[in-house]
């Protein structure tokens, strides 16, 4: 006589919590699976709404220094308030973020100062 699905459900329904825990562990070992909850995938249309919102925080990235390295270092010092050595290290390490998480106006102002000094700047 074969065991039916209903027989299995009745047997599982009659088990205690400890017995069910042991059963789950046995299934995991026997079949190489995990009973951990799986992450739910986002709905396909959900990403469009987030992209439509206006970005409020921007990162000012120094992409290239250009020919006027001294002028760019001065601009970085003015924008960030860093010391001479720290500003020079930042400029030498380009591409690097000069300002992060700033509003649109501050990002535009920093970009203008850096570009006026001869640097190539990205705002993301």
Swiss-Prot record:
SUPFAM superfamilies: ClpS-like, Ribosomal protein L7/12, oligomerisation (N-terminal) domain. GO terms for biological process: translation. Gene3D superfamilies: 3.30.1390.10, Single helix bin. One of its GO terms (molecular function) is structural constituent of ribosome. One of its GO terms (cellular component) is cytosolic large ribosomal subunit. Keywords: Ribonucleoprotein, Ribosomal protein. InterPro entries: Ribosomal_bL12 (IPR000206), Ribosomal_bL12_C (IPR013823), Ribosomal_bL12_C/ClpS-like (IPR014719), Ribosomal_bL12_oligo (IPR008932), Ribosomal_bL12_oligo_N_sf (IPR036235). CDD domains: Ribosomal_L7_L12 (cd00387). NCBIfam families: L12. Forms part of the ribosomal stalk which helps the ribosome interact with GTP-bound translation factors. Is thus essential for accurate translation. Belongs to the bacterial ribosomal protein bL12 family. Homodimer. Part of the ribosomal stalk of the 50S ribosomal subunit. Forms a multimeric L10(L12)X complex, where L10 forms an elongated spine to which 2 to 4 L12 dimers bind in a sequential fashion. Binds GTP-bound translation factors. This is Large ribosomal subunit protein bL12. It comes from Cupriavidus pinatubonensis (strain JMP 134 / LMG 1197) (Cupriavidus necator (strain JMP 134)). The lineage of its organism: Bacteria, Pseudomonadati, Pseudomonadota, Betaproteobacteria, Burkholderiales. The gene is rplL.
């Amino acid at each position: 006589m074969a065991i039916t699905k209903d027989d299995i459900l009745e047997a599982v329904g009659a088990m205690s919590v400890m017995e069910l825990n042991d059963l789950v562990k046995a299934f995991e070992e026997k079949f190489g699976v995990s009973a951990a909850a799986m992450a739910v995938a986002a709905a396909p249309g959900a990403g469009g709404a987030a992209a439509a919102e206006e970005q409020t925080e921007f990162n000012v990235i120094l992409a290239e220094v250009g020919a006027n390295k001294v002028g760019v270092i001065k601009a970085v010092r003015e924008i960030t308030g860093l010391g001479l050595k720290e500003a020079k290290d930042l400029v030498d390490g380009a591409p690097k973020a000069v300002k992060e998480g700033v509003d649109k106006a501050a990002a535009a102002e920093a970009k203008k100062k850096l570009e006026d000094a001869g640097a190539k700047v990205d705002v993301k």
